[in-house]
């Protein structure tokens, strides 16, 4: 499976030859470096580990420095991707955005924007109560359940709580354009996370027919 790490730059729009507007998200994908290779004989499966975004030496602990010494790099983020074969990969090899091409279908994983503590209307899309005519029910969560039996609040009751800042995957997005020289990938539509957040881009596992 092909996969890379990238940093969300932001959203913009491009125009097709027919003048159709396409909203796209720009992702700075690379350059990355192969930091480790795993094989069936040694590890039980084939995989490559890649490092993304340069780090200062003082920001890394000794175990991580020792791990990255073979590739002779200092990287903040490490990610492992399983592959069918490790042929063609070497430790220290540079990987750029051109592993994907325009028209490819991808899955993008990132950490969603944190919204803090939110009520059931914003967090779950619950309907609100009337504003006027003597109503005292506006933005409250509603019934907690029966009184004497079962005498408790059921699990998964939609209540207020922490919203966002969770791992989210958006599937079957389309790569609109790849600029290998600038290490940019333009993805159709929105992807999870805030500007500057790190995202994982993989081949789509459920390709639309």
Swiss-Prot record:
Residues 117-142 are annotated as: Disordered. This is Large ribosomal subunit protein uL3. One of the primary rRNA binding proteins, it binds directly near the 3'-end of the 23S rRNA, where it nucleates assembly of the 50S subunit. It comes from Clostridioides difficile (strain 630). One of its GO terms (molecular function) is rRNA binding. Belongs to the universal ribosomal protein uL3 family. The keyword Ribonucleoprotein applies. Keywords: Ribonucleoprotein, Ribosomal protein, RNA-binding, rRNA-binding. InterPro entries: Ribosomal_uL3, Ribosomal_uL3_bac/org-type, Ribosomal_uL3_CS, Transl_B-barrel_sf. PROSITE patterns: RIBOSOMAL_L3. Part of the 50S ribosomal subunit. Forms a cluster with proteins L14 and L19. GO terms for biological process: translation.
């Amino acid at each position: 499976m092909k996969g890379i790490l990238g940093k969300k730059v932001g959203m913009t729009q491009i125009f097709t030859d027919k003048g159709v507007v396409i909203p796209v998200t720009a992702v700075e994908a690379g350059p990355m470096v192969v930091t480790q290779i795993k094989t069936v004989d040694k590890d039980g499966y084939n995989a490559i580990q890649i490092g993304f975004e340069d780090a200062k030496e003082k920001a890394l602990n000794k175990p991580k420095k020792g791990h990255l010494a073979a590739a002779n790099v200092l990287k903040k983020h490490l990610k492992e991707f399983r592959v069918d074969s490790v042929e063609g990969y070497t430790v220290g090899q540079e990987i750029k955005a051109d592993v994907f091409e325009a028209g490819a279908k991808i899955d993008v994983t990132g950490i969603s924007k944190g919204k803090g503590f939110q009520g059931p209307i914003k967090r779950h899309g619950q309907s609100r109560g009337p504003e006027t005519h003597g109503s005292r029910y506006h933005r409250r969560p509603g019934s907690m359940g029966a009184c004497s039996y079962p005498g408790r609040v059921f699990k998964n009751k939609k209540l207020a709580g922490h919203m966002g800042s969770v791992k989210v995957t958006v599937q079957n997005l389309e790569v609109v354009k790849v600029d290998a020289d600038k290490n940019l990938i333009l993805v159709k539509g929105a992807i999870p996370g805030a500007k500057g957040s790190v995202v994982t881009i993989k081949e789509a596992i459920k390709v639309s027919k």
